[in-house]
Every structure is written in structure tokens, then in C-alpha cells.
Amino acid sequence: MDVKRVKQILSSSSQIDVTYQGVPVWIESCDEGRGIAQVHDITAPHETVEVDITALEEK
């Protein structure tokens, strides 16, 4: 995935399915300068991690 698409997903009112290493995640925010996004596993909303945006996949 790229930064532009992450920003589109963040501003969308629709639920868009995204995975990180095969795990469904919710994107919390993105840091365009660093190329990372803060995400959490949809089953564990209190466990936010930073991941490389290019590792995110839209399903």
C-alpha cells in the first residue's frame, strides 16, 4: 500500500478491509514523512503498533 491510499482509507466513511501480515487491522493514523502507520488488530484495539505502510494490504 502507499501513503496516498492510507490517507484515503483514513478519510473514508466506509469500512475498508486492510491486513498486516495476514491479520485484519484498523489504521489509526499515518506518518507520511516516516512511511509508517499506527494500526491495531481488529480483535485487540488497545494494542497499537507502528508498521511500514508498504506492508499493509487492502483486501
Swiss-Prot record:
One cellular component term from this protein's GO annotations in UniProt: endospore-forming forespore
Chief localisation class: other
Protein encoded by which gene: sspH1
Family the entry assigns: Belongs to the SspH family.
Subcellular location as annotated: Spore core
Keyword Hydrolase on entry: no
Pfam families according to UniProt: SspH
UniProt keyword terms in alphabetical order: Sporulation
BP-aspect Gene Ontology terms: asexual sporulation; sporulation resulting in formation of a cellular spore
Top-rank taxon, per record: Bacteria
Induction record: Expressed only in the forespore compartment of sporulating cells.
Protein name as catalogued: Small, acid-soluble spore protein H 1
